């Protein structure tokens, strides 16, 4: 059995999720859907989903259904799906707790996560970090009873996103999130408005930082 010889990870995953063997034969990555209203279940659901979809990619590679480029693209797509669903449920959670952030004209402002590096280039492998930069369109405040200014709101959401993706649980972790490519690196603010980001790159950004955004 080629899979048993090639990947202990894949075999362990199939032993842990025996009802999911059919996933190996699926032509595309299965959607990720978190339990409604149960945030405590999200980390486990994300990690089990990632393990099973990773086993599927390994299976397809071993059986020569996909070449290296297709496999890297699938791994990157898997991360995109995980990030998209995570941002969706966290946006709903924060809206319920703090309301929605609106600018001076009453327009709703949304969380934006830019994928850089191998994620931005569609070249992730199974051991890659996920390089993210957090932003939001314009300054504002949330309209809930527990109001937050836009920067605090989206900073907290970004922190929760990194925890959901990267914290180690009994199911392992899903992705290591690297936020060091943001303006000013580790000393910089976690989430910036578009205007603040533009100002940084026009005044203080270094050439290599601008080049990194080619793959965003």
Located regions from the model:
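A nucleotide- and high-energy phosphate-metabolite-utilizing enzyme signature
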Residues: 1-216
